[in-house]
């Protein structure tokens, strides 16, 4: 399956729910998260793609492709190009470091809140990396 698709979103949700590390590190987290991948024709991504994750107290209550409105109004929205997402999912880059370097943009949400949940962000990316998927 390809990353940032409906099937991938559901598989990531299942992976989050199997992750004991995520359950513990995100135990007090409340709020939806949108992960957005920017279009980049050179990398085979013809249109923006975004995944909506209903994250609540260490569990994923559901995940799907985000609507246009959700991609702009979710409490936390992260956006990056395909190359950055590939590096994140390969474990070559950590999410908080990527935000600090400007590779992963925090489009919406509070940076101080994100810092408090740095381990949860790492555990979320680690769980998503367990999903066998390909990039376009």
Predicted regions, residues:
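Feature captures hydrophobic
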Residues: 1-136
């Amino acid at each position: 399956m390809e990353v940032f698709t409906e099937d991938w979103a559901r598989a990531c949700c299942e992976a989050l729910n199997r992750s004991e590390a995520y359950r513990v590190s995100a135990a007090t987290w409340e709020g939806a998260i949108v992960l957005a991948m920017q279009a980049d024709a050179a990398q085979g991504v013809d249109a923006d793609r975004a995944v909506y994750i209903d994250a609540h107290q260490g569990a994923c209550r559901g995940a799907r492709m985000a609507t246009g409105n959700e991609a702009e109004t979710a409490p936390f929205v992260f956006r990056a190009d395909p190359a950055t997402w590939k590096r994140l999912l390969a474990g070559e880059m950590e999410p908080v470091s990527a935000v600090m370097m400007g590779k992963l943009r925090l489009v919406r949400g509070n940076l101080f809140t994100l810092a408090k949940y740095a381990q949860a962000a790492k555990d979320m990316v680690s769980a998503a990396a367990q999903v066998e998927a390909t990039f376009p």
